[in-house]
Amino acid sequence: MKIKIEYRKLGREQAHGIAESDGIVIIDSRLKGKKHLEILLHECLHILNPMDDENAIIDKSVTLCKILWKEGYRRVDNSNDTPLQDGSK
């Protein structure tokens, strides 16, 4: 499944992020750091698990965010050299 990430200010929508049914995730461009990671995970989980209720999505996104943040994940390196498990980059 392909998910496209877009960034724009979402003040009018009163949301940090939006997941659209066509696989587009919109993230508020003002988010930084750990909150950015949490919302990115949250909106992607909505697309990957459309039957989950909001509380399940929140639980999963917060758990994943805490694990990744503790492991040192930060949005710094944009290199694409090593393929993922499915062979894609």
Indicate where each model-derived feature is located:
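Active-site recognition of the HExxH zinc-binding catalytic motif
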Residues: E38-I47
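Metalloprotease/metallohydrolase-associated module, dominated by Zn2+-dependent proteases
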Residues: M1-K35, P50-K89
